[in-house]
Amino acid sequence: MLSCRLQCALAALSIVLALGGVTGAPSDPRLRQFLQKSLAAAAGKQELAKYFLAELLSEPNQTEIDALEPEDLSQAAEQDEMRLELQRSANSNPAMAPRERKAGCKNFFWKTFTSC
């Protein structure tokens, strides 16, 4: 997680430095290609997006809850349930789902699952 943050910070820093150098320099097509590639690489970071979503959702809303009237507390509870649901969906990874085996299937080969 720390290395991902560090990579993103370095990518952002390099983009800022590149943009700062571009303002005074003549237009170079190689520089444009470099910037486009670096922006495309930074946009594909799904883990970073999940992390920021989880961090945003985990921030406490205690001041909002204190300001609500008693009838609004049920709405706050529903919002908390929705927030927990979003956290669960952000943290779930379908690629890591455990393998399901049908009844009667046996593992004959010790390295892999057999298909039944």
Curated annotation (Swiss-Prot):
Pfam families: Somatostatin. Disulfide bonds join C105-C116. One of its GO terms (cellular component) is extracellular space. Residues 25-88 form a propeptide. This is Somatostatin. Residues 1-24 form the signal peptide. Belongs to the somatostatin family. GO terms for molecular function: hormone activity. The lineage of its organism: Eukaryota, Metazoa, Chordata, Craniata, Vertebrata. Keywords: Amidation, Cleavage on pair of basic residues, Disulfide bond, Hormone, Secreted, Signal. The modification Alanine amide is found at A43. It is found in: Secreted. Its main location: secreted. One of its GO terms (biological process) is regulation of cell migration. C-terminal amidation of the neuronostatin peptide is required for its biological activity, including for the regulation of mean arterial pressure.
